[in-house]
A protein has these predicted regions:
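ABC transporter TMD-NBD coupling linker
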Residues: 293-355, 394-396, 401, 410
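Helix-loop-helix
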Residues: 54-70, 160-175, 249-318, 323-324
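Transmembrane helices of ABC transporter permease
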Residues: 22, 26-39, 142-197, 270-281
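ABC-type nucleotide-binding domain
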Residues: 339-415
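Cytoplasmic coupling helices
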Residues: 88-107, 148-149, 172-217, 224, ...
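Membrane-integrated ABC transporters
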Residues: 1-41, 61-67, 86, 90, ...
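An intracellular "coupling" helix at the cytosolic face of ABC transporter transmembrane type-1 domains
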Residues: 18-25, 111-117, 131-140, 144, ...
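Transmembrane helix-loop-helix hairpins at lipid-water interfaces of multipass membrane proteins
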Residues: 27-82, 162-167, 283
Length: 415
C-alpha cells in the first residue's frame, strides 16, 4: 500500500465529514436530543439543590419540595428517553456511513486488482477492511454530535451560572476549556505517533498470521513450525507493547480529566464563598453555582475522552484514504487495439517486487496453438511471468509482445 505523508487531522476530518451531508437531518436531531438530555441530567442535581433551599426556608425558584422532586422525576425519565434516541441516531448515521465507506473501499480494490490482491500485504488489506473501517465508527457516532452538544451545553451552563454571578461562570468556563479543549489536544498530539505505530503493528501481525496459514503445508514439510511460532509470538508481543502504551495514555487522560474537574469545582466553590462573604452572592447562589459545576461536565468529559481515541481514528482514516487515492499499478487500456492471439514473446524481460528482483533478462517465445511448459525451482518467477502476460504489472525492463503488438498497446478487455 502506498504510504501517505500522514495527512493533518483537519484534512482527515474534512474528508470524513463530507460524507455526513446526506444524513444532516438525523445528525441535527441527534444534537438536539443530546443537548436536551444533558440539560436534563444537569438539572436533576440543580433541582435537588432547589429542593434543599426550599426545605431550609431559603430563597428558591420552586415553591415546594414536592415540586422540586416532581421535576427531578420528569428530568430523569426524559434523560433516559433522550439518551437512547441520541445514541440510536448517532449509530444509525455511523453504520450507514461505514457501509458507504466499505462500498468505496471495495470499489477501489476492484480498480486496483488484480495486482493489489497479488501483493504481499493481504493481511494489511484485511486489517484495513475490518479494523480500520470499524474504527471510523468512533468519529461518526461519538465525535461530531458530541462536539456540537458540548459547545451548546457549555454556552448554556456558563450563561446559567453567570445569571447568579459572572465570576463563578468565568471559572467554570475556564474549567470547561481545559477539560474539553486543552486536554484532548494535548493528548492527541502526544499519542499520534503511538496510534499510527499500533495500527501498523496490527496490520503487520495480520499479514504475518495470514502468510503463516497460507504456507502451513510448507512449514510442516520443512519442519519450520518452531520458527513460525516464535515469529507470531514476537509480533504479538510487539502489538501488546504498542497497545499497552496507548492504554497508559488513556488512563493518564482519564486521571487528568477527573483532577481538572475536581479542581474546577473547588475553584467555583471557593469563588462563590468569597463572593458570599463579601455580600455579593447569597447562600442559594453558592449552592446552585457549585452544583452546576458538579453536574455539568458530562458533555465536556466526552470530548476529553476523545483525545486518545481520535488518534487511532485518524491513523485508521489515513490508511483508508491511502487506499482510496491509490493509483492502479497498470491502468486499463481502452484506446488500444483488439489484437487476436497470434503467439506471444518476451524479450529481455526483467521484473522485481519492490527491491527483490524475480526475473532478469528473460527471453521466451510462445507460438500460437502450441503448449509451452515453464519449469523452474520454487520462487524462480514462473507464476510472476504468467501474470506479466496478463499484465497484472508492467515489466521493469524489456517488453512483452502479443503477435507484433506491444502488450501495453493492447486493450485490457482483449487480453
Amino acid at each position: 500500500m502506498n504510504k501517505s505523508n500522514h495527512r493533518s487531522p483537519f484534512a482527515i476530518v474534512g474528508r470524513l465529514i463530507v460524507l455526513v451531508k446526506p444524513m444532516l437531518p438525523v445528525m441535527l436531531a441527534a444534537i438536539v436530543m443530546g443537548v436536551a438530555g444533558h440539560f436534563c441530567a444537569t438539572f436533576i442535581t440543580i433541582f435537588g439543590g432547589f429542593g434543599i433551599l426550599r426545605a431550609l426556608g431559603l430563597a428558591s425558584p420552586v415553591r415546594t419540595v414536592g415540586t422540586a422532586f416532581a421535576c427531578i422525576l420528569v428530568f430523569a425519565l426524559l434523560r433516559g428517553v433522550l439518551r437512547y434516541a441520541e445514541q440510536a441516531s448517532n449509530h444509525y448515521i455511523a453504520f450507514k456511513l461505514l457501509a458507504l465507506i466499505r462500498d468505496k473501499v471495495f470499489g477501489a480494490l476492484r480498480r486496483l486488482t488484480p495486482a493489489k490482491l497479488e501483493g504481499r500485504d493481504r493481511g494489511d488489506l484485511i486489517s484495513l477492511i475490518t479494523a480500520d473501517i470499524e474504527a471510523l465508527e468512533v468519529f461518526y457516532a461519538h465525535t461530531i454530535s458530541p462536539i456540537c452538544i458540548a459547545c451548546i451545553c457549555v454556552v448554556g451552563m456558563t450563561g446559567f451560572v453567570g445569571s447568579w454571578h459572572i465570576l463563578p461562570a468565568l471559572v467554570l468556563l475556564a474549567g470547561y476549556l481545559l477539560v474539553g479543549v486543552a486536554l484532548p489536544v494535548w493528548s492527541a498530539k502526544r499519542g499520534d505517533r503511538a496510534a499510527r505505530e499500533y495500527r501498523q503493528a496490527l496490520a503487520d501481525t495480520n499479514s504475518y498470521v495470514l502468510e503463516s496459514l497460507r504456507g502451513l503445508k510448507d512449514t510442516l514439510q520443512y519442519q519450520d513450525t518452531a520458527a513460525r511460532a516464535e515469529g507470531i509470538t514476537a509480533h504479538s508481543e510487539t502489538l501488546g507493547e504498542k497497545q499497552k502504551f496507548l492504554k497508559y495514555r488513556e488512563g493518564l487522560t482519564v486521571a487528568l480529566t477527573n483532577t481538572l474537574i475536581l479542581l474546577t469545582v473547588l475553584a467555583v466553590l471557593g469563588t462563590s464563598l468569597s463572593l458570599y462573604q463579601s455580600g455579593k452572592l447569597g447562600a442559594e447562589g453558592v449552592l446552585v453555582c457549585t452544583l452546576s459545576a458538579l453536574s455539568s461536565f458530562g458533555p465536556v468529559v466526552a470530548l476529553a475522552n476523545l483525545g486518545v481515541g481520535l488518534t487511532q481514528v485518524f491513523a485508521s482514516a489515513d490508511r483508508v484514504l491511502d487506499l482510496l487515492e491509490e493509483e492502479p499499478v497498470t491502468a486499463d487500456v481502452t484506446d488500444g487495439t483488439d489484437t487476436a492471439f497470434a503467439g506471444a514473446a518476451a524479450e529481455h524481460v526483467s521484473f522485481a517486487y519492490a527491491e527483490e528482483e524475480i526475473l532478469h533478462d528473460l527471453s521466451l517465445t510462445i507460438p500460437e496453438k502450441k503448449i509451452v511448459g515453464i519449469t523452474g525451482r520454487s520462487g524462480s518467477g514462473k507464476s510472476t511471468f504468467l501474470r506479466l502476460l496478463m499484465r497484472f504489472w508492467d515489466v521493469s525492463g524489456g517488453s512483452i509482445r502479443f503477435g507484433e503488438q506491444d502488450i501495453r498497446r493492447v486493450n485490457t478487455a482483449a487480453l
